[in-house]
Amino acid sequence: MSKAIENKQVQVQEITEKFQNASSVVVVDYRGLNVAQVTELRKQLREAGVEFKVYKNTLTRRAAEAAGLEGINDVLVGPNAIAFSNEDVVAPAKIINEFAKKNEALEIKAGIIEGTISSVEDVKALAELPSREGLLSMLLSVLQAPVRNFALATKAVADQKEEQGA
């Protein structure tokens, strides 16, 4: 087997593993972005622990088929870059969506969330969700509300009794 074929097989295996291990994947068309813009996007994604790579479409298609994600092959046309996140499901969608708002040349094509192929609308909806910390703080405030209201009601009753007794 030639060295080139072996390298391609290794790349397909690498991409397949990334598809299988990633909690979320976002496929984008980066046509029209200059080098400085792509570098800025890579920097933002790297800071969030997201890997952003450009692979050949044929290798990506083979990897998607091996990972059982054949449905993503429809969008693998033209220059594509793929963002893989192993930890935070929301991070790649949020960063890329914000970047796409500022740079209209960046186009979100599709996503894979928890092993399920998602449309552009799904990826954008995911991007609009608050972060994990934000969701936890919302949950905490909802859980604290009854206790806080009870404490305020108790204090109001105590103040009222004090006024009547004075």
UniProtKB/Swiss-Prot annotation:
Asked if the Swiss-Prot or TrEMBL record annotates the protein with the keyword Ribosomal protein, the reply is yes
One GO BP annotation of this record: translation
Question: Which keywords label this protein?
Answer: Ribonucleoprotein, Ribosomal protein, RNA-binding, rRNA-binding
Question: CDD domains annotated for this entry?
Answer: Ribosomal_L10 (cd05797)
**Any one of the GO CC terms:** large ribosomal subunit
Q: Name one GO molecular function term.
A: large ribosomal subunit rRNA binding
Q: What does this protein do?
A: Forms part of the ribosomal stalk, playing a central role in the interaction of the ribosome with GTP-bound translation factors.
Q: How does it assemble?
A: Part of the ribosomal stalk of the 50S ribosomal subunit. The N-terminus interacts with L11 and the large rRNA to form the base of the stalk. The C-terminus forms an elongated spine to which L12 dimers bind in a sequential fashion forming a multimeric L10(L12)X complex.
Alphabetized HAMAP family for the sequence: Ribosomal_uL10 (MF_00362)
State what protein this is by name. Large ribosomal subunit protein uL10
